Amino acid sequence: MTVALWCILIALFLAPLCALIAKVSSGRFGLKDNHDPRAFLDTLSGLPRRAHAAQQNSYEAFPAFAAAVLVADIVGNAEQVTQDVLGVMYITSRLLYIICYLADWAALRSLVWFAGLALIVSFFVVSA
């Protein structure tokens, strides 16, 4: 399997990582909260709330990234190393995005989000 395809798997686990951060950093998540974790997550504020928002955004961004990687892989017009580099850069941008969200660096977070979007578009461009 290529690095770019492995990046799809890595991207899939970024959202659950954010959920874990939200629950653990709240300091009050217990077994009873696991019966309705969405209701629990809606009560959060501060860092745990931002981690939950990063989780939601990670789920929203995942389908476009996965589709872009798969299109590039199937079409086969782009060099594999190009696809792999774009995949690693995207994962890096998502990690930076999560860090910016957790740190409440809103302006930088938006810039990093746009960089991630540009990387998704890049998969299609190099595949044309």
Question: Predicted regions span which residues?
Answer:
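Interfacial loop-to-transmembrane junctions
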Residues: 93-118
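Structural signal for membrane-spanning alpha-helices in multi-pass inner-membrane proteins
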Residues: 19-26, 72-73, 101, 120-127
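Membrane interfacial helix-start motif at the N-side
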Residues: 42-63, 100, 106
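Transmembrane helix-loop junctions in multipass membrane proteins, especially transporters and channels
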Residues: 23-31, 77-81, 106
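Cytosolic, membrane-interface loops and tails of multi-pass inner-membrane proteins
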Residues: 24-52
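Core segments of transmembrane alpha-helices
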Residues: 14, 57-71
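Helix-coil boundary and interhelical linker segments in multi-pass alpha-helical membrane proteins
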Residues: 1-7, 70-85, 122-128
